[in-house]
Amino acid sequence: MAEVKPVTAVFPGTFDPFTRGHFSLVMRGIKTFHKVIVAVAGSTSKNTKFSLEERVDMAKRIFEHHPQVEVDSFDGLLVHYVEQSPANVIMRGLRAVSDFEYEFQMALMNRRLDNDIQTVFLMTDYKWMYLSSSIIKDVAVNGGDIKGLVPRQIYDEVIERLVPGK
């Protein structure tokens, strides 16, 4: 029988900001994989509210007591980052059918670029199916309550940045 090697997964994203949905996926990921690398995307077409350094720092604070989680950043193609990392799996979360089409296309393109890299999809916990960083930003900017929607370690920083007059 072939020896089973520890599998490291990369969980990529903009994380602007990190949500409880993201956190839930990473915590489920470390039950499935030996290690999860949270890879914060630097070059993105999204209009981010937090700099790359701030997003990396927030993720590091969230996972500082979780030795199976490493936080890193990358620019360029995700496949190139994964090829240079100890990982051989890309971990992605799916909230709804609408996520699947986009994620499926990306997984196929990544596989075309490097056939040795697999993409694994985890369904988002039902409590967080509606949640996205964009929704968090929209609710906060318009005075809505986001307590419990972002990890407590970054709540104050997110409020300070997003809520007018804070």
Curated annotation (Swiss-Prot):
Superkingdom classification of source: Bacteria
InterPro entries per UniProt: Cyt_trans-like (IPR004821), PPAT (IPR001980), Rossmann-like_a/b/a_fold (IPR014729)
Cofactor(s) the protein requires to work: Mg(2+)
Coiled-coil segments: none
Binding site for substrate: 14, 46, 78, 92
Pathway(s) annotated for this protein in UniProt: Cofactor biosynthesis; coenzyme A biosynthesis; CoA from (R)-pantothenate: step 4/5
GO CC, any one term: cytoplasm
Subcellular localization: Cytoplasm
Gene Ontology BP terms: coenzyme A biosynthetic process
Residues the UniProt record annotates as site (Transition state stabilizer): 22
Keywords: ATP-binding, Coenzyme A biosynthesis, Cytoplasm, Magnesium, Nucleotide-binding, Nucleotidyltransferase, Transferase
NCBIfam families, per the entry: coaD_prev_kdtB, cyt_tran_rel
Record function comment: Reversibly transfers an adenylyl group from ATP to 4'-phosphopantetheine, yielding dephospho-CoA (dPCoA) and pyrophosphate.
Summary of subunit composition and partner proteins: Homohexamer.
Protein name per the record: Phosphopantetheine adenylyltransferase
Organism: Maridesulfovibrio salexigens (strain ATCC 14822 / DSM 2638 / NCIMB 8403 / VKM B-1763) (Desulfovibrio salexigens)
